[in-house]
């Protein structure tokens, strides 16, 4: 009997949002401007992606409701999330007739990089961070040897799909992109540009705020699901370096309350805690 599983690519798992809240937010700009924005802050596709309020179809409907816009800017500040959801979002945006610009405001890590790589252009704030790392597997059930072999096959397939996307975006070989992923790499915006993941670095004054809240990494008041000590030094060194106009802090990440439901098996991409 096949085992149910969920594949995610993120720094760590977080509790799901309330069912009434999708994890994305669209908005049209001024009437006649023919531009729209998509906000992807926090985890991409938590478990709420699969309930009746936040589904791939709802995302497609929200995207279609924008109408005939010429440009969509996707603002990203995310530690990752569900691989299949990130692929669905990325492919829907890529198929859209509008020019899609991904703008990395703070952190673009793990599955969030999948969405960014589907954009026509990737712009990063000068003090933004980019991170790639390999998927890992968390098993929460009794599995036979055949079950485990099937899990490994699925994991290898997902890794291969992501590596191929990276190679397409960067123009690098799949071997080089695979090595980057397997080693786990954190890059500054400039380094991500040098490696081909970012097309342009925005040198204007940035609002990025890095915080250590009870030992966890927060970027622009959004929890990244990663222990602060796991972040590289160039990220930790930005703590408290808030510029005018930065985001205000909140006690908790909105919507991140509740109990994480149990899954029989997960394939995840996270740092060892």
What is the predicted function of each stretch?
Residues 1-111, 119-273:
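N-terminal organellar transit peptides
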């Amino acid at each position: 009997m096949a085992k149910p599983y969920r594949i995610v690519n993120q720094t760590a798992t977080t509790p799901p949002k309330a069912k009434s809240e999708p994890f994305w937010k669209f908005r049209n700009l001024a009437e006649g401007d023919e531009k729209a924005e998509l906000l992807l802050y926090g985890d991409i596709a938590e478990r709420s992606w699969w309930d009746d309020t936040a589904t791939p179809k709802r995302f497609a409907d929200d995207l279609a409701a924008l109408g005939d816009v010429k440009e969509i800017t996707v603002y990203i500040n995310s530690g990752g999330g569900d691989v299949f959801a990130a692929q669905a979002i990325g492919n829907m945006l890529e198929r859209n007739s509008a020019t899609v610009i991904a703008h990395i405001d703070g952190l673009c890590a793990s599955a969030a990089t999948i969405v960014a790589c589907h954009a026509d252009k990737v712009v990063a704030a000068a003090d933004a961070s980019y991170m790639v790392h390999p998927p890992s597997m968390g098993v929460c059930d009794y599995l036979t040897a055949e079950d485990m072999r099937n899990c490994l096959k699925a994991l290898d397939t997902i890794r291969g799909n992501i590596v191929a996307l990276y190679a397409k975006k960067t123009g690098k070989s799949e071997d080089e992109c695979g090595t980057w992923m397997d080693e786990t790499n954190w890059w500054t915006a400039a380094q991500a540009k040098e490696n081909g993941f970012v097309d342009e670095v925005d040198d204007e004054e940035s609002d990025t705020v890095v915080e250590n809240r009870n030992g966890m990494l927060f970027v622009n008041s959004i929890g990244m699901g990663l222990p602060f000590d796991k972040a590289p030094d160039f990220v930790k060194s930005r703590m408290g370096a808030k510029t005018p106009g930065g985001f205000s802090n909140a006690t908790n990440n909105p919507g991140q309350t509740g109990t994480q439901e149990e899954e029989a098996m997960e394939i995840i991409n996270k740092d060892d805690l």
